[in-house]
Amino acid sequence: MRCTIFYSAAFIASLTSAAPTGRRQSSLSQDGNYFPLANGFPKPNRDGEITIQDGAHGTLPNGPPPPALSAEGTTNLKLIALNELFEVAFFTELIYNITNKVSGYDLGMGHDYMLDSLNAIVNQEELHVLNANGALEHFNQETIQPCKYNCKLSSLDFSQLVTDTLIVPVEDFQSAIALAATFTDVVLGTLQDVNQIFAKNQDDGLVRAVTSVVGNEAEQEGFFRLMQKKRPSSQPFLTTATRDFAFTAIQDFIVPDSCPNIATIPLKRFKPLAVETKTIPAKNQNIKFSFAMKDAGMYDTNDMRLTYLNGQNQPIVEKFENVKMEGEKVFFEALFPYDDFLMNGLTIAAVTMGGDEFDDADKMAEAAVFGPGLIEVD
């Protein structure tokens, strides 16, 4: 066991210290269009499906589908397909960069192991899409089609990730893994909501399969955390989320107006909330946020609150402090009460209206106007 631990530490060090090769930065997709893949995904023939299953080290579920699907269950499956399609695009781009040793993605002795791991992950995500869309098709519902995605992982045009140390431009392997860990955390929280909604709407026949996906995503998350030299598990009860928060977060990676049928998903999209603070250590502190002045409309900042979601706790509501209007943005601060609640792992932040207390994540999302701001602390 001790030898294994030391070997793992040395392996991780080789990944984090690998120097850029100096090769030009490039991207698999210049216009954000990643599909179809070589195996025919997202609509593979039988041979393509077998290839995907071989790469995923397992098969699609072959049991009988449930007898019926509710309207809320349909929304669940569409959201799952939307998210998993993005993940396939993301990991396909990441595999391309590692395979071609794009600047920032030369992993030295860890190259082959990482490619083997990521190839398994991307094939597993493809099966998640096929399973969700297959269920929709079985119940004569419209399947979710791919969008175009902002997955140029070697480009500073990509989004930024707030971690417990700094804002990381996604321009290298470590930044990409940190981003993957954060959106996987959001998925793990959202699938809790999905399963509860299935159960409430007599779609319990889908809970077992989706829970197996929760386990798969959690295995991935532990791997991503290990690659960042973090503990494999962040907290005893993972942060919950809601479908609306996930639906909004996914669209940060989507080229606007590129989704053929995202409008068939009846979920709410919030206005953007930026986490401006670059360093967020594990302690009580004020965090700076911002949102666009044009999105504020007739809202009064005196009526706004910054609300946090962490673990399985009730939402934490904090008042705005130091509100400033600068340029086209509204800046404000709010207390991040880490010490009071041990806010490790993912915290979801949102600007809410109409209350200083919310019973649960659903009530918080109903009152949210801006969000989600995603914060990772370890």
PLM region spans:
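Fungal secretory targeting signals
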Residues: 1-26
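All-alpha RGS (Regulator of G-protein Signaling) helical domain and cognate RGS-like helical scaffolds
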Residues: 22-378
